[in-house]
């Protein structure tokens, strides 16, 4: 009976150790995925920022051209 108890204890202990290792690996994988998501979000923000900047520059140039045309028409 004593041998059976020791064997059962060893099996349970090894099961808990392997479960703990699996949980740790799972947490590491989740952390890596979260970091990848953060990097992708930063890339998207950078793309939106450059897109909005380019749109702003284009709108500014268009407005400047419109004002210049109005001034030129007023001089004629």
From Swiss-Prot:
Acidic residues bias spans: 30-41
Positions carrying Glutamine amide: 73
Region (Disordered): 25-44
Recorded GO CC terms: extracellular region
Compartment(s): Secreted
Signal peptide: 1-22
Main location: secreted
InterPro entries, A to Z: Dermaseptin_dom (IPR022731), Frog_antimicrobial_propeptide (IPR004275), FSAP (IPR016322)
Keyword Signal attached: yes
Tissue: Expressed by the skin glands.
Key words, A-Z: Amidation, Amphibian defense peptide, Antimicrobial, Cleavage on pair of basic residues, Secreted, Signal
Superkingdom classification of source: Eukaryota
GO biological process, alphabetically ordered: defense response
Propeptide: 23-45, 75-76
UniProt record similarity statement: Belongs to the frog skin active peptide (FSAP) family. Dermaseptin subfamily.
Task of the protein: Has antimicrobial activity.
Name the UniProt record assigns to this protein: Dermaseptin-H1
Source organism per UniProt: Pithecopus hypochondrialis (Orange-legged leaf frog)
């Amino acid at each position: 009976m004593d041998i059976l108890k020791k064997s059962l204890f060893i099996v349970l202990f090894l099961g808990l150790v392997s479960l703990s290792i699996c949980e740790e690996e799972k947490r590491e994988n989740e952390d890596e995925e979260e970091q990848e998501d953060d990097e992708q979000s930063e890339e998207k923000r950078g793309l939106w920022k450059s897109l909005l900047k380019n749109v702003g520059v284009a709108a500014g140039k268009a407005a400047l051209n419109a004002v210049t045309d109005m001034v030129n028409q007023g001089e004629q």
